[in-house]
A protein has these predicted regions:
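Bilobed "Venus flytrap"/periplasmic-binding protein-like clamshell domains
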Residues: 1, 32, 53-126, 142, ...
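A ligand-binding cleft/hinge motif common to bilobed small-molecule-binding domains
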Residues: 28-42, 96-102, 127-156
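General small-molecule cofactor/ligand-binding pocket signal
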Residues: 5-7, 116-117, 159-161
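Periplasmic-binding protein-like
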Residues: 47, 52-62, 150-196, 200-202
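N-terminal hydrophobic or amphipathic helices and topogenic motifs
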Residues: 1-14, 200-202
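Short helices/loops that flank or line small-molecule/ion binding pockets
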Residues: 8, 13-27, 40-41, 59, ...
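Short beta-strand-centered segments that line the small-molecule binding cleft or hinge
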Residues: 25-27, 35-60
Length: 202
């Protein structure tokens, strides 16, 4: 067996740096961050989570407004205050940026939005809308569903004005600096873990 030590990091880029510097051997990355980790930190994806009862792990980026918002369609976000997750987040930054570009909007163009800010997490992004700090937020459907399930908010409080195309799930990756033998053991343990208990988390 292996002795496991957990390292908490502040953001996605810190997770990449931890593996690059040898402070972390395994990390759960967002899709965008994994590409960077594979390029500079010798990361190799080997698993992705699938929730019980689901056939695939794809999810979406949602654009969410309050139920009583004057914003009725996605194109009406122009000129409003937008909140996102964190820089480097797949469903809370990259995919929202891509979706906005499809309607010729950019978060870096000051003429397109009244204000754009990063809330720091998907949950904080949602709360920024509920607390009237932002008109619209771009966030992960996974977190939206989780907060709905734990009664952080009620569905009648909000509206989803846009949903992205399906997004591949965030991969669990290990460093190629780990021996092949140990990587195979880790992969086997992770892929069989659901046979021995319930796995929670992201």
């Amino acid at each position: 067996g292996f002795e496991i030590n957990t390292v908490k990091v502040t953001d996605y880029n810190a997770a990449v740096e931890a593996m690059r510097a040898g402070r972390a051997d395994i990390a759960w990355y967002g899709g965008k961050t994994y590409i960077k980790a594979a390029e500079i930190a010798d990361a190799e994806a080997f698993a992705a989570g699938v929730r019980p009862g689901e056939k695939n792990a794809n999810y979406f980026a949602y654009f969410v407004v309050k139920a009583d918002s004057q914003i009725k369609s996605f194109s009406e976000v122009k000129g409003k205050t937008l909140s996102l997750n964190t820089i480097g987040s797949t469903s809370g930054d990259l995919i929202p940026q891509v979706e906005l570009s499809k309607i010729n909007l950019s978060t870096t163009n000051k003429k397109h939005f009244k204000n754009v800010f990063y809330a720091g997490s998907h949950d904080a992004c949602l709360l920024s809308v509920l607390n009237d700090q932002a008109d619209v937020c771009g966030m992960s459907s996974r977190n939206f569903e989780a907060r709905l399930a734990d009664n952080t908010f009620r569905m009648e409080q909000v509206r989803i004005i846009h949903r992205s195309d399906p997004v591949p799930p965030p991969p669990l990756a290990y460093s190629k600096k780990i021996s092949l033998k140990d990587r195979q053991k880790i992969k086997k343990a992770v892929l069989e873990a659901h046979n021995y208990g319930t796995i929670g988390g992201y």
